[in-house]
Amino acid sequence: EAKSWITNRKELVENGGFTFEYSATFGEITDKDETFNEYASCVIFDYRYKYFYEDGFGKDYSILNLKDNEKYGDEYFTGAMLSLYEQKLYYRNYSRQIKPFNLENPLMIFVGSSVSGKKNESDVINVVRFLARFVNEKELFSRLIKDILTDKSSLVDTNDQPLFSSKFPYLRDMIRRDKEKINEIYRDLVKDLFHSGTSKTLQFVELKNAEGEIGLRFDSEYFGVINIGDTNSFLKLIENEEDAPYFNKTPIKSHFDKSLFNKIEKKNSNINFLIGSKKFIEGWNSYRVS
């Protein structure tokens, strides 16, 4: 694919034209092949991501590599839920103050490298399984939330310090001012992020008017959308999933709902989670991405 792109580029500029290209990751290329050598001889300005970020562009990032997904996965994902919940609270409570920064209602995205492989290898299956468990297993995740916010989490760094000790300053400040708040966070989070009311069964809705999209909901209101290429293979995995007591394994087909992905940028969008493959991140930009 890369080689065909190079051929097309050469055809476009062969009659005295030229290209001016920008790459944020060229300096990190590991394979020193012909393509690398060709580009290396043409660099006129080194503005790799390190400098791009230091000049105030891009996003802050935090990379947490888990040595044991089975042991620490629940705490890791719970920390992610708290992060999104905190950002949404701050966005609502300080919308006027942050308006000059062009920030929008926070959206969490999960980009999986595997979508419809074997069920134990599908990143997307693992994500939706966790989301369903989070809404249903109140006792477990209420405890994990309290452990994280009181620095009792078993997730530690190389110095055996709680991994989340410097995270969630806004939530921690709320708890310091009102200790009862910590008991309300799980309930409010589930209501805010998942629009969950009476139903606790995760429904998968195949949107026939939106190719590659599957809507996620517990009640009538969608909270998330899966955006992948092969929806049929993924829905087959759901139907055959054994470790999913909180799934409605019979997919619902909707011939009326429009694309949820296309509505993400709308001010009144209820979508808080975008889950899918790498296909939607190329050529797509959003101020909502958390």
Language-model segments: residues:
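Signature of the SF2 helicase/ATPase Hel1-core->accessory helical subdomain module
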Residues: 1-99, 106-108, 262, 277-290
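Conserved C-terminal RecA-like helicase domain
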Residues: 1, 93-274
